[in-house]
Amino acid sequence: MSQFKTGSRADCIGPARGSNFGPMSHSAVPATEVVIAADCWRSEASAEATVLRAIEAAAAMVDADTGEAELAVMLTDDDGIRALNASYRGQDKPTNVLSFPAPQPDYQGAAQGSDVAPKLLGDIAIAYQTVRREADDEGKRFDHHLSHLAVHGFLHLVGYDHETDAEAETMEAAERRILAGLGIPDPYADQDRVS
């Protein structure tokens, strides 16, 4: 299903380039595999459930046909995401989340009920230490920040971006709407402080 192989981060291969998956007419929950590629995530017992809940909420609120789709989320560490970031973005440093949209074949004209394979949306990688550090530095709950990053990564897989101010505003509005549906405060405001 995934470009991320279960096991060590050395088993990860990178993204396929040139995604053209864009918004379609309806949404449904994609099959989502969560791969724990770094032991540090095991201290967060609810991390997998948090990610799955965020992906489900995002899929339910965006205008993209994801019901027959598959994606993988790799929960890695700073070393793992740093290697991916260096290899695919030329930035030799850790980051919080990376998304690797898969290229999409043209399914138009495929007969209903045919043997057309599910769409691979792509892969998301999330780094534990960076997520933990950002949540602590910003006074946010870890699960809220993890949810935000899973939603952010998913939105990239279905065609959202933030290269321009207008794109960023659209993407942030979608993130706020999805997270509000999960009872999570606006991640761009100061209201999610841990007391």
Swiss-Prot record:
Single strand-specific metallo-endoribonuclease involved in late-stage 70S ribosome quality control and in maturation of the 3' terminus of the 16S rRNA. Gene3D superfamilies: Metalloproteases ('zincins'), catalytic domain. This is Endoribonuclease YbeY. Zn(2+) binds at residues 152, 156, 162. Keywords: Cytoplasm, Endonuclease, Hydrolase, Metal-binding, Nuclease, Ribosome biogenesis, rRNA processing, Zinc. It comes from Rhodopseudomonas palustris (strain HaA2). It is found in: Cytoplasm. One of its GO terms (molecular function) is zinc ion binding.
